[in-house]
Amino acid sequence: MRIAVLSDIHANLPALEAVAADLPPVDEAWVLGDTVGYGPQPNEVIAALQAMGARSVMGNHDGAAIGTVDPVDFNPDARAAIQWTAGALDANARSYIAALPLVRADGEVTAVHGSPRDPIWEYITGPAIAAANLDAYETRLCLFGHTHLPVAFRALDGEIDATIGLPGTEARLGSERAMLNPGSVGQPRDGLRDAAYAVLELNGSSADDTFEFRRVVYDIDRTQRLMREAGLPARLTERLGYGR
């Protein structure tokens, strides 16, 4: 089985469209939350994911946009974008977000946005935090987003191995537990501005399973123009150009 793994699209339709066009043949698409927030096209992104039949979980920006997550910890630009998003969402988008689970598990894979443990919006940024989360889910693999940084954390011989998700890098998974982050489709923060996603390949034998990190160029100028037209914060618009 091949699963497209997307996260942190953040209402960036041109980035999502570029990823969809770049995808190899896959059996399923999983989205790890923060479908909206920051970007200018929340309704269009949600409609596109519905058309793809994507299996999604809720992120903190998704919940904040419909009032189920308190944005008290958001920075001023993020709060301003959420206020704009809340006013822009149509009825279909609100219903879609409200129905999203915080955790999704199927077979050997668990999907969350931030963390499988409390606090669920924890940022898993390094091996020590990943190690502390390994017992918080029941499956072999855990897919997560939230940090906007592509990485694979794998348990190997009692240690945590971290593979940075450079474009084209393929992490071989094996039988041990692993936590896998595809990076961000709509607002990368690893210094590369291209949309990031991954393909998880489950081959029936854990020794042959892989997680491939992929990047694709998208029309950043189009997204930035729409953000300016919407009056979204300038810093959010500008950061797309340098991937931070």
Where are these regions (language model features)?
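Acidic, His/Gly-rich catalytic cores of divalent-metal-dependent hydrolytic chemistry
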Residues: D157-R244
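N-terminal active-site segment of His-dependent metallophosphoesterases
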Residues: M1-A54
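Beta-strand-turn-beta hairpins that frame and shape the catalytic cleft
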Residues: M1-A4, A105-A111, L173-M179, D209
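Active-site neighborhood of phospho(di)ester-bond hydrolases with catalytic His/Asp-centered motifs
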Residues: L6-S7, A29-D34, R55-N60, V112, ...
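Active-site environment of divalent metal-dependent phosphoester hydrolases
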Residues: H10-A15, G37-P40, H61-I66, R117-P119, ...
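Anionic-ligand binding region
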Residues: P127-E170, S175-L180
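Active-site neighborhood of divalent metal-dependent phosphoester bond hydrolases
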Residues: V45-I46, A51-E138
